Amino acid sequence: MQFSIFAQTCAALEAQNGRLEMKHAISVILPSLSGEDLPIFIRFLMGKIFPDWSPQKLGIGPNLLYEAVAYVAGTKKTALVDLINRTGDAGLAIEQFLATKEQTAFFTEDPSLAEVYAACTRIAASAGGRSQRERLLVLRQLFGNVSPFEARYLARLILGELRIGIGEGTVRDAIAEAYTVEPAQVEHAMQALNDLGEVALRAREGEEGLIHLSIAPFRPVKMMLAQAGTTIPEMLAAHGEVAVEFKYDGTRFQFHKEGKTCRIYSRKLEEVTDAVPEVGEALLGATDHDVILDGEVIAIGADGRPLPFQTVLRRFRRKHGIAAAREAITLVPRVFDILYRDGETLIDLPFQSRRAILSATIGPEYLAPQQVLSSAEAVDLLYLEAMAEGHEGVMLKDLLSLYSPGVRGKHWVKIKPEVETLDLVVIGAEWGEGRRARTFGSFLLACLDQGVFRAVSKVATGISDEQLQELYTLFKDQVIAESGNTVTFEPTVIFEVGYAEIQKSPSYESGYALRFPRFVQVRDDKAVEEIETLESLTTRYLAQKTQANGQPEFTL
């Protein structure tokens, strides 16, 4: 397939409104693709170049991309950036920008999908002092060989957001329709392979190609997620008894071991082995089996109590000074699930069976404590214990649940203190991406400090597409400054925002940040003078610390 045909396909899909129409349109194309093009087409369609688990990363930021496009157009990068600021969509802006320039280099070639993929592979492989130059040269060649229309989708692909409204579920169902297999079979294969491109290749073989698949070390699996909102009585009523574990204030990890080699992956499936060597060493010595384990890394303070999760997160992101950081902060793994052992895939076993295998695999030192309980009173007591020890709450797990990679469902439920809310004024925003490209995607919030607004946090979660349009209408005439992707508003609109925790943070002028901020509503009934003050925010922060130290007041 030529990239020009891929771009036309994207445009046709972008113009579609219905998911079923999109699914069918994709399913018609798939059987015509070669074995080489099929996985590339699938990944590109989802705005990806490499599988999520792949160590290959493109490493191209907007500035380098804009520099390459400006060179092809024979003009300055600032002119392109100005156009992007006005449109809010880099792909459309680049198309318009190149269309207005006479550039004889266009169409010297009509690259195929495979050629574009090969160029991206060269970019990902570039390293050393000349890597930036090498990447720029490849980008120039790519954009010099496509039309302005094709450049729209090439730019979006490189930036990782195709903006055509295609999700994993649509592609999954299109694969099923194209090759006459069940969507559930495609989903199961996706859970094992974590790459819909490879799943499509397997599906070409029919049902036989999708069965007997197994997960394997060093190919990370999306992590199963928990949902909030379900109560303790509801879980017990549904399941009779549940496994109850502490909900740790740490960072999720996946541990892979084969022989004497181990690797650790973050929730984003990025390898972080070198950043947290003590975790790998601990678990490597804890088992002789080849395994894939799921758990949480927590940081422990000198008093034996857990430290905030940002402490662990900083370690996960660290590239240098690992030895010194290791001396300063104690990291401990808490393992609560096992997905694979000695060649056997375990995700289709019930949780209680996986737990029994896990207990026999790593021993008690790093095993997350668990109790199987059947009464709300017993769960309440464990919840109190978790809070008193400085944890976030408890996890309730269905003993019969299978491991569903990447799924947030009712089989795992987190019980935490009720979410508090703050009233904060909106002082700025960032333009959105994807479906939010022509609206504001996230909003900057502030509290009041002696007549001065101090930034506290950004919020993007909890806002529906309809609300985004309403908020755009509300704010569009209140823009007082714009720079790059950010705008500044007159501080007149108040948001009520829920949050899980107030945290110390140098990232915002107030000195605080909100963990898991979520939009609740616009407070039209409040004046700006009534918003949260820095003093009251500090009071909330200190009270929150007191609760964590063993005097909690909460509602179950």
Swiss-Prot record:
GO MF: ATP binding; DNA binding; DNA ligase (ATP) activity; metal ion binding
EC number of this enzyme: 6.5.1.1
Cofactor: Mg(2+)
The protein's enzyme class: ligase
Catalytic activity: ATP + (deoxyribonucleotide)n-3'-hydroxyl + 5'-phospho-(deoxyribonucleotide)m = (deoxyribonucleotide)n+m + AMP + diphosphate
Record GO biological process: cell division; DNA biosynthetic process; DNA recombination; DNA repair; lagging strand elongation
Keywords: ATP-binding, Cell cycle, Cell division, DNA damage, DNA recombination, DNA repair, DNA replication, Ligase, Magnesium, Metal-binding, Nucleotide-binding
Keyword DNA repair annotated: yes
Homology family: Belongs to the ATP-dependent DNA ligase family.
HAMAP family: DNA_ligase (MF_00407)
Name of this chain's protein: DNA ligase
Organism, as annotated: Methanosphaerula palustris (strain ATCC BAA-1556 / DSM 19958 / E1-9c)
Gene field: lig
